[in-house]
């Protein structure tokens, strides 16, 4: 695994869900592709069930501008990330063809910061431990929504923090923020609506 130098805990950790994806197969279906359009497409425009929908690619581009605007200030509550993380799906090729990687690919290219994929979905406690013990600055994690609550609960948040126990299937438009409390090793939890695309909600995810 890629091991960055040991450093102080990150000042900020952002967690986002990947961009819009194809519909899931019908309940009970085995090995079936999504039932119909819209289809996922890879970076070359080929149909691919693991890739983003065209709207997801739009979000990917918009996220690059959200976290690194060409002009004007960043949105309140956000800073430019210096570390980008997404899940591993085995080989490098498979990882780079997956929507979690694709969602921050544009930001990676814009910043010149590689995407690190050391951990698979289901390894959230280990990922959280690595993030707080081996990274510094501002970290952005793009993850699969069913596993984001587990990741959030594995981070050292301030006592009594209410974190949503589920990420709604229809929400692709929120940034979860974890801000290091000065003088402590604990994080304050917050949420920032992205409001990047038509139809994005202005509300946060209820705890």
For every predicted segment, state its role.
Residues 4-136, 147-207:
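Active-site-proximal alpha-helix that buttresses catalytic centers in soluble enzyme cores
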Residues 142-144:
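Short beta-strand segments
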Residues 139:
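Mobile, glycine-rich extracellular loop/lid and propeptide segments
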